[in-house]
């Protein structure tokens, strides 16, 4: 792969690479931001990058990477700008690792880190490229850096993949890999976004995905222990899109096997064209906290992931490819 362009943000960089057959592929490297108390409020609402810089965690403490797994994406999610890019198939294991190598080569000053969280879903649905994605995760140990890798498998969990696997097959393979290879230190995140299955299907552009009920039943009844990292259900919070905490509890959401992540809807071209509006972001963060507290009443671990106001443009998947292609 060759370098095409880059976009700089206060906390890191978005890179646009190009495959040998000329397809644009995004990857990113970011530092995490402190989210404690008053600092969190200050960072969240600022348009001054200097304030962001003051609150960045060190590379030695935590580093955030993402790589793409497909040339575009087979799905047409209504909030994601990758949907507008023509789909050209899976990236090979080598092409995925070339992105990792590029990110490391671009940051030679980062030689060790207690946690390198690397997401395999910048562009593409990794469930459709499972063999190459897991192969790339396995090969992370070959890079000559003192890193504690924490790979992240982010998926909408299609009912049937293009490789012929069922959604349950994908869950089993990823969880077994998580436990056998990474001793539990792999983060499995499943995009949910609503507890209304019809609304979920609409948001995923008509994709046939496993229902939340099926996911909860499968994970709750998984025969082997799920250690170190529980399975995370991701919800992008949007106005008019229901997230029924009581319904999730009725399904048997088990705090020993599940966590929840609440994410504001980012400002994308697709979300604007489809009239999707975030329920909460940096300007009314208390609404996000109110939803979080409903989960916490049931002892469900909850993470809120809100970006700063000055970082919104250019951060989302597919946006750099649209600008320069």
Descriptions of predicted regions:
Residues 61-65, 81-218, 222-226, 230-238, ...:
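Core AdoMet radical
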Residues 1-25, 31-44, 217-325:
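Auxiliary Fe-S-binding modules of radical SAM enzymes
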Residues 15, 22-83, 93, 109-122:
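N-terminal pre-triad scaffold of radical SAM enzymes
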Residues 6-8, 68-69, 155:
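Short linear Ser/Thr-Pro motifs
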Residues 76, 126-128, 322:
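Short, electropositive, low-hydrophobicity segments enriched in small/polar residues
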Residues 73, 153, 317:
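A residue-level signal for conserved active-site and pocket-lining positions in enzyme catalytic cores
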Residues 75-77, 197-198, 269-272:
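Short acidic/His/Gly/Ser-rich catalytic and metal-binding motifs that mark active-site loops
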Residues 71-73, 192-194, 264-266:
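Short, small-residue-rich loop/turn micro-motifs
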């Amino acid at each position: 792969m060759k370098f095409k362009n880059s976009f700089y943000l206060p906390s890191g960089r978005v890179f646009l690479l190009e495959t040998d057959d000329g397809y644009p592929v995004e990857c990113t490297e970011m530092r995490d931001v402190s989210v404690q108390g008053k600092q969190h409020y200050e960072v969240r609402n600022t348009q001054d990058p200097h304030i962001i810089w003051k609150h960045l965690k060190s590379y030695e403490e935590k580093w955030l990477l993402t790589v793409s797994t497909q040339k575009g994406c087979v799905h047409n999610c209504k909030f994601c700008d990758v949907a507008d890019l023509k789909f050209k198939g899976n990236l090979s294991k080598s092409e995925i690792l070339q992105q990792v190598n590029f990110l490391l080569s671009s940051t030679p000053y980062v030689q060790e880190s207690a946690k390198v969280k690397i997401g395999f879903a910048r562009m593409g649905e990794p469930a459709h490229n499972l063999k190459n994605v897991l192969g790339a995760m396995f090969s992370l140990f070959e890079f000559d850096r003192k890193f504690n890798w924490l790979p992240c498998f982010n998926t909408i969990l299609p009912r049937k993949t293009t490789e012929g696997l069922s959604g349950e097959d994908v869950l089993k393979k990823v969880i077994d890999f998580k436990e056998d290879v990474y001793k539990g230190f792999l983060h499995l995140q499943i995009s949910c976004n609503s507890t209304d299955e019809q609304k979920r299907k609409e948001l995923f552009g008509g994709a046939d995905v496993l229902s939340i009920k099926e996911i909860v039943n499968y994970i709750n009844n998984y025969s082997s222990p799920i250690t170190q990292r529980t399975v995370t259900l991701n919800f992008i919070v949007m106005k008019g899109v229901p997230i029924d905490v009581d319904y999730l509890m009725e399904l048997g959401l088990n705090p020993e096997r599940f966590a929840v992540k609440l994410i504001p809807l980012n400002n994308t071209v697709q979300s604007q064209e489809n009239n999707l509006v975030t329920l909460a972001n940096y300007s009314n963060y208390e609404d996000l906290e109110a939803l979080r507290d409903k989960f916490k009443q049931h002892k469900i671990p909850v993470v809120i992931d809100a970006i700063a106001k000055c970082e919104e443009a250019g951060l989302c998947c597919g946006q750099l490819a649209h600008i320069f292609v």
